[in-house]
A protein has these predicted regions:
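Primarily recognizes the serine-hydrolase "nucleophile elbow" in alpha/beta-hydrolase
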Residues: 220-292
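Short beta-strand element of the alpha/beta-hydrolase
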Residues: 163-174
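N-terminal cap/lid segment of alpha/beta-hydrolase-fold proteins
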Residues: 15, 22, 32-60, 64-65, ...
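C-terminal catalytic histidine-bearing segment of alpha/beta-hydrolase fold enzymes
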Residues: 2-31, 37-52, 324, 328, ...
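Short amphipathic alpha-helix adjacent to the substrate-entry channel of hydrolases
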Residues: 181-199
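Short alpha-helix in the alpha/beta-hydrolase fold that links the catalytic acid
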Residues: 300, 309, 323-333
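Short beta-strand/loop motif that positions the catalytic acidic residue
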Residues: 307, 313-315, 319
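Acidic catalytic loop of the alpha/beta-hydrolase fold
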Residues: 285-286, 318-322
Length: 384
């Protein structure tokens, strides 16, 4: 009896179940299922490949002693394969959903069904990891303030084209952890390769830092980008602010508090304007310990959005780290108050952290972000 095969398939089944049905509570169980299901949720085809390899090895090795052994193996394999198929199907719907969200905001999705998307789809199916193109340079650990955590990495093309917009990315991690090195690599690489100047910044974290410290860091990074984008060929007048989870929280507040001196004490006159926002699986409620009526608002949901720049928001329906309700509420607020209708793409089956690998889902989102920025921030890049 091939017990090793049975245990392997059952183990994979646990990962698949965690991705399909992650609980919201209790918190400990939610965190465990998030960790177990995060990767397989984005690249289920690799799970299917493992199933095929394990089954093939058992057949070649003659591990099946009786027909009952074969029946059990086939039943387990079919059950887990069905779960993997469901994960893949949910991920593949993302492109149509992003396209519909763009159309809802009055933007025609140029990249949703063209040959470029198909070619890239094959590439990420075979190799689902973001690799920095040879055309893109990364300049590491540039200081944007006096604190040791106030450092950023700059991504730009080797040939330094001029006139491209700029992008500031802030990582997630609940304000407790995370760094500029891990999330949204595909976003930074793709836009840098297009001729943008892209920046990924660290910021001070809890428990040594509080809400105003985080916002000061976000604003200082913005001010640095406005001042220094031209050093790398970028146009500092056009800045897209983006982030994942906590980074999306900071980005949204920064966009709704442009030039507000309360959020940038000590450098009140610095340019911290934002041209557009991209929020990935963001938390948009109040900061730890704050209430909705805090003197210094820590939630975009209670801030004035009448002058808000264009927003692109996306969130997964099974996110058990930051509720999708937050994004729904922010999208509704922007529709009611903002000058431009937001793009809001709600992705079936997407979990927190979907930007950690290059997947079908994240590729569809990146195509949507390109369409969004092309519409609200026309790109004019001069190649040298």
């Amino acid at each position: 009896m091939p017990y090793g095969l049975y245990f392997s398939i059952a183990g994979l089944g646990i990962f698949v179940a965690a991705a399909l049905w992650p609980p919201q509570r209790p918190r400990v169980l939610a965190n465990i299922t998030y960790i177990l299901g995060m990767v397989i949720n984005e690249i289920p085809h690799y799970g299917a490949l493992l199933l095929a390899i394990w089954l093939g090895i058992s057949i070649v090795s003659g591990d099946f002693g009786t027909p009952a052994d074969i029946t059990v193996a086939v039943a387990l394999t079919a059950l887990v394969a069905a779960g993997l198929f469901a994960l893949g199907w949910r991920a593949r719907t993302s492109r149509a959903i992003v396209a519909a969200a763009l159309r809802d905001a009055g933007i025609e999705p140029a990249r949703s069904s063209n040959g470029h998307a198909t070619r890239r789809g094959w590439q990420i199916t075979l190799f689902p990891f973001a690799v920095r193109p040879r055309s893109v340079v990364r300049e590491r650990n540039v200081s944007y303030g006096p604190h040791r955590k106030q450092q950023l990495d700059v991504y730009y093309r080797k040939d330094r084209p001029t006139g491209g917009p700029t992008l500031l990315y802030l990582h997630g991690g609940g304000y407790f952890l995370g760094s500029k090195h891990h999330e949204a690599r595909g976003l930074l690489y793709r836009f840098a390769d297009r001729g943008w100047v892209c920046v990924s910044a660290n910021y001070r974290l809890r428990p040594r830092a509080g809400f105003l410290d985080h916002m000061v860091d976000a604003k200082r990074a913005l001010a640095w980008l406005h001042e220094h984008a031209g050093d790398y060929g970028g146009d500092g007048r056009r800045v897209v602010m983006s982030g994942s989870s906590a980074g999306a929280h900071m980005s949204s507040i920064s966009a709704l508090s442009q030039q507000d001196p309360r959020y940038q004490p000590g450098f009140e006159s610095a340019d911290t304007s934002v041209s557009a926002v991209v929020g990935l699986y963001g938390y948009y409620g109040p900061y730890y310990g704050d209430d909705w009526n805090a003197a210094l608002p820590s939630s975009p949901l209670v801030m004035d959005a009448s002058s808000a720049p264009p927003f692109f928001l996306t969130h997964g329906t099974v996110d058990n780290n930051a509720s999708v309700e937050n994004s729904r509420e922010l999208a509704a607020k922007l529709r009611a108050e903002a000058p431009t209708r937001p793009v809001y793409a709600e992705l079936p089956g997407a979990q927190h952290g979907f930007d950690l690998v290059s997947s079908w889902r994240f590729e569809a989102i990146l195509d949507g972000i390109e369409d969004f920025t092309d519409a609200v921030l026309p790109v004019s890049v001069n190649r040298r």
